[in-house]
């Protein structure tokens, strides 16, 4: 079965990167729009073909004893929770990532493989970086292809 990858960089404005093994696209928008888009992608992919579905989400760490919302309210946490639910609903592998994991992936690396998608808030770039990290960890992509 082929792989279908969806990476999300959550926030009030979120980034989304989708790759089916050959073609890729990215989009940036409000969190609820991106969550809805992830659901439609997972639903379509599960109906059109037998895909191995993968959902990559950037995790969030809450400070201990924090009773106040993060700078974006609770939107980021709600998005991550909804994406976790959608991954389970559609039988996708959930791959949470610490935000720091994408730090070693440069814009030059993304440009080399054709995954540099400029956006005002850089969320599409961040979601592409998360996808690269996941593919490196799964050994689908090799670091030599990026440098």
Question: Regions from the language model: what does each represent?
Answer:
Residues 1-147:
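Phosphate- and other anionic-substrate recognition elements at nucleic-acid/protein interfaces
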């Amino acid at each position: 079965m082929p792989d279908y990858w969806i990476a999300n960089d959550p926030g009030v404005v979120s980034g989304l990167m989708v790759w089916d093994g050959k073609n890729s696209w990215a989009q940036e928008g409000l969190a609820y729009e991106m969550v809805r888009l992830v659901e439609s992608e997972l639903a379509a992919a599960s109906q059109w073909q037998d895909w191995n579905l993968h959902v990559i989400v950037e995790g969030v760490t809450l400070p201990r004893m924090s009773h106040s919302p993060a700078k974006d309210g609770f939107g980021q946490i709600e998005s991550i929770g909804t994406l976790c639910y959608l991954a389970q609903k559609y039988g996708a592998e959930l791959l949470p990532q610490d935000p720091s994991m994408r730090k070693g992936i440069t814009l030059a690396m993304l440009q080399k493989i054709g995954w540099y998608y400029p956006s005002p808030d850089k969320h599409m770039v961040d979601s592409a970086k998360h996808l690269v990290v996941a593919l490196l960890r799964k050994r689908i992509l090799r670091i030599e292809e990026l440098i």
